[in-house]
UniProtKB/Swiss-Prot annotation:
CDD domains: YajQ_like
UniProt cross-references to Pfam families, sorted A to Z: DUF520
Species for this entry: Aeromonas hydrophila subsp. hydrophila (strain ATCC 7966 / DSM 30187 / BCRC 13018 / CCUG 14551 / JCM 1027 / KCTC 2358 / NCIMB 9240 / NCTC 8049)
Protein name in the entry: Nucleotide-binding protein AHA_1129
Assigned GO CC terms: cytosol
Length: 160
């Protein structure tokens, strides 16, 4: 029986490349001349440091642009609040890895409400979709791509 998995993963090596590009852009921008500001990747999160809160907001936009250039959707970012310590401001950006239980339930409900002849089952942090026809699976993929679920979805293990 044909099947595929719906997952939500962010490639951390692409995030590393985006952070490097953002640091390079930060070094060349005129409005950051003479300002100590940096992006730093720690495992699953990016730490932003700057002298002022408005600079952090600009840095988040620089990071968003760098991530888009590396084909990472902005909906995978979870931007935290800025924290002031001493004369520096810090902000942490985390990335959503895997599908949460609530999002998985919404996804299964969306697929079942569409009346497409497929079955969806939650398996840990991914959703497995099985059906009798390949066309039904492709229709389900189009449905999931068009849905606004708050994080990007990828499809893996398409088996015929």
């Amino acid at each position: 029986m044909p099947s595929f998995d719906i997952v939500s993963e962010v490639k951390m090596n692409e995030v590393l490349n985006a952070v490097d590009n953002a640091n390079r852009e930060l070094a060349t921008r005129f409005d950051f001349r003479g300002v100590e500001a940096s992006f730093e990747l720690n495992k699953e999160e990016v730490k932003l440091e700057a002298d002022a809160d408005f600079q952090l907001k600009q840095m988040v936009e620089i990071l968003r642009a760098a991530l888009l250039k590396r084909n990472i959707e902005n909906s995978s970012m979870d931007v935290g609040d800025s924290v002031h310590s001493g004369k520096r401001f810090h902000l942490t950006v985390k990335f959503k890895q895997g599908i949460d239980k609530e999002v998985a339930k919404k996804l299964v409900k969306l697929i079942k409400d569409s009346k497409i002849k497929v079955q969806a089952a939650i398996q840990g942090d991914e959703v497995r979709v099985t059906g009798k026809k390949r066309d039904d699976l492709q229709e389900t993929m189009a449905l999931v791509r068009g849905a606004e679920l708050g994080q990007p979805m990828q499809f893996q293990n398409f088996r015929d």
